[in-house]
Amino acid sequence: MLKYMKQEANMTTTENGAAAYVSTGSKCLDLFATIGALRGQSEKEIIARFVQAYTEDADLAMKLLFFARDIRGGLGERKVFRTILGWLAKNEPASVQKNLAYVAEYGRFDDLLALMDTPCEKEMLIYLRKQFEADMKKLAEGGSVSLLGKWLPSVNASNQETVYQAKKVARAFGMNDAAYRKALTALRAKIHIIENHLREKDYTFDYEQQPSKALFKYKMAFWRNDRERYQAFLSKASTGDAKLHADHVSPYELVESYLNTRWNSTFSEEKASLNATWAALPDFGGEENALAVIDTSGSMYCGRNPIPAAVALSLGLYFAERNKGGFRNHFIEFSERPQLIEIKGETFVDKLQYLTTFEEIADTNLEAVFDLILRAAVKNQVPQEELPAKLIIISDMEFNACVNKASKTVFKNAKRRYKEKGYSLPEVVFWNVASRNRQQPVTKNEQGVVLVSGATPRIFSMVAGGNLSPYTFMMEVLQSERYAPIAA
């Protein structure tokens, strides 16, 4: 009886009435499936989800936390990492102290400032001082230094919280404000951070040497103050004669920039920067016979930073354009009804202008997507191998209730309907970009399905190949060599 009560208690519904599960059956997997989609959530909710995972398996939860922050191999989520790190410092300080040296390695040095005014503050400041002293020694010897100087807080900042932190850091380093400021100036000059050049109106720097985030952030400043050199750089980048760094720019940032500036008088300049940056994004496309399915329903416009619909559209375009399989340059957009869209246009902006004419802001009928593919296959007697091998569903997971057998989840219903017609349902990747509620589309051992979350296209390469279950996939990611050093 207890087993059946647990099963019944684990059933819930989406905002649109579809059957769903409260949990996958693993709190760590629940977090793994949503941790990249929590930017719009409160700190209280983020911490609650992590505490459940940490209680279930502390080591795995810590690996998951660093995977979420990992800017090179993971999701690159800053807010959720710092929120959880602050909670850990107050409640599980030993776990933080054990992993202190990995914080900047997987993220940035300023992530450590989340430990200010916690039981881990002393150890954090000692760690920063050691790195600072090593950098100052290398600076005196003419060697290279770390990026610590870039991310340390400035005592002359306009934000009072930053000033407070900077003064604490300076005193921990045994310095007064003036000496600390002078040291930071020297370190930043050695690092050649672009902000120094912009502040001094020094446009002699090499665009090819600038980090991706800075290039994207200051693009309009380059147009205003260094038009000729910047335009020449973009032209060279477009022909492959110059390297434009875009490895840490997310596709949604380009989509949102387009949506925010397309009516501006300076859009012709913005357009050139967007096109060049999009072309320079790293390629995680692959060669699978896979098809992206993006949600543009009304709920995908709830929330900001980023707008979930912008994330979904950017990833759909990115994958369709870069995937070399049989569905190249196509994706399905769904709301009330699915639309199979062929991408048209030469440049990123051309394609985006075209795609925005298809948006249908209504409800979230995922069942109709599965039915579209099945109808086309049955009607034309298409062999199984010509169907998409994988459907990558990018959504907030708030699906409509099924028309038939509404007590079953959308996934269970689709599996049944395909089997009745003599087909196997393609593998499904449920990719969450806005987790507003604690509900999951499948449980942990469901075969042929994977649960992921986030805004980075790196996930496309992670989910390539393999008929996995959600839990197996999570373990493959978190037990990889990259996260081996991390433990509670």
Residues covered by each model-derived region:
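Long lumenal/extracellular ectodomains of secretory and single-pass membrane proteins
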Residues: 1-311, 321-488
